[in-house]
Amino acid sequence: MRGGGNMQQMMKQMQKMQKKMAQEQKKLKEERIVGTAGGGMVAVTVTGHKEVVDVEIKEEAVDPDDIEMLQDLVLAATNEAMNKADELTQERLGKHTQGLNIPGM
């Protein structure tokens, strides 16, 4: 069987990569990423898995006559945190898939 050794080696490499990626996924779940808006008046914290775990709103951000501004600040901070989480995930997991042509990675 020619090439059997290459296939076996490739399978070992894939298993090793899967193990490393699982470890990185676990680390990402523990990461905390903060997005802010309004000069820090609103801060949203997410995990590396993009789960919102904290929202902080400073008192001066709350204006009963302008609720829309507060909503916009919360959205902006959330989007910033999510984008940072995406970048971190790509950075952490991408190094394990470099050179591979895997759709979605």
Swiss-Prot record:
One of its GO terms (molecular function) is DNA binding. Residues 1-33 are annotated as: Disordered. The keyword Transferase does not apply. Residues 21-33 have a biased composition (Basic and acidic residues). The keyword Cytoplasm applies. Gene3D superfamilies: Nucleoid-associated protein YbaB-like domain. It is found in: Cytoplasm, Nucleoid. Pfam families: YbaB_DNA_bd (PF02575). One of its GO terms (cellular component) is bacterial nucleoid. Keywords: Cytoplasm, DNA-binding. Residues 7-16 have a biased composition (Low complexity). It comes from the Bacteria. HAMAP family: DNA_YbaB_EbfC. Belongs to the YbaB/EbfC family. Homodimer. Binds to DNA and alters its conformation. May be involved in regulation of gene expression, nucleoid organization and DNA protection. This is Nucleoid-associated protein SaurJH9_0500. It comes from Staphylococcus aureus (strain JH9).
